[in-house]
Amino acid sequence: MKRTFQPSVVKRKRTHGFRARMKTRGGRAVIAARRSKGRARLSA
């Protein structure tokens, strides 16, 4: 049986990357929340 997680750096960055987050209002909210929490990594 094929596993569900088939890693790909390109797909990861395109879906969860910083620029992808900045494109939508909700994504910007995510970045803001992570900034206020003091996360070391804001996005993938």
Curated annotation (Swiss-Prot):
Tell me a GO cellular component.
Answer: ribosome
Q: Which Pfam family, an example, fits this chain?
A: Ribosomal_L34
Q: Cite the record's Basic residues compositional bias ranges.
A: 34-44
**Which parts of this chain are annotated as the region Disordered?**
22-44
- Sequence intervals crossing the membrane: none
Q: Which domain of life is it from?
A: Bacteria
What biological processes does GO assign it?
translation
Tell me which UniProt keywords the record has, alphabetically.
Ribonucleoprotein, Ribosomal protein
Under the GO molecular function aspect, what terms does this record hold? structural constituent of ribosome
Family membership, please give it: Belongs to the bacterial ribosomal protein bL34 family.
Q: What is this protein called?
A: Large ribosomal subunit protein bL34
Annotated organism of origin:
Laribacter hongkongensis (strain HLHK9)
Q: Which gene does this sequence derive from?
A: rpmH
